């Protein structure tokens, strides 16, 4: 299952863990996904995964 927002398509970012000795190890920063139910035009409900930042924007009404 992809760790990606269904609306904004935000996905994992790649970065480095950097130690005091300046050694670098790869790390993944995953999006904060939440499972929500959304009602479609035909009246059925569907469960999708949405990033928390997208959910805040939806609730704000912007």
From Swiss-Prot:
SUPFAM superfamilies (alphabetical): L28p-like
Gene3D superfamilies listed in its UniProt record: Ribosomal protein L28/L24
**Can the keyword Glycosyltransferase be found in this entry's annotation?**
no
UniProt keywords, alphabetically:
Ribonucleoprotein, Ribosomal protein
Q: Which GO terms describe its cellular component?
A: ribonucleoprotein complex; ribosome
One GO MF term attached to the UniProt entry: structural constituent of ribosome
The reply to whether Lipoprotein figures as a keyword in the UniProt entry is no
**GO biological process annotations for this chain's record?**
translation
Q: Which InterPro entries match?
A: Bacterial_rp_bL28, Ribosomal_bL28, Ribosomal_bL28/bL31-like_sf, Ribosomal_bL28_bact-type, Ribosomal_bL28_sf
Q: Which family does it belong to?
A: Belongs to the bacterial ribosomal protein bL28 family.
Protein name from the UniProt record = Large ribosomal subunit protein bL28
By which gene is this protein encoded? rpmB
């Amino acid at each position: 299952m992809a760790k990606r927002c269904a609306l904004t398509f935000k996905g994992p970012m790649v970065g480095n863990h950097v130690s005091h000795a300046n050694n670098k190890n790869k790390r993944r920063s995953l999006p904060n996904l939440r499972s929500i139910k959304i009602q479609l035009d035909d009246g059925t409900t569907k469960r999708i995964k949405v990033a928390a930042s997208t959910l805040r924007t939806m609730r704000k009404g912007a």
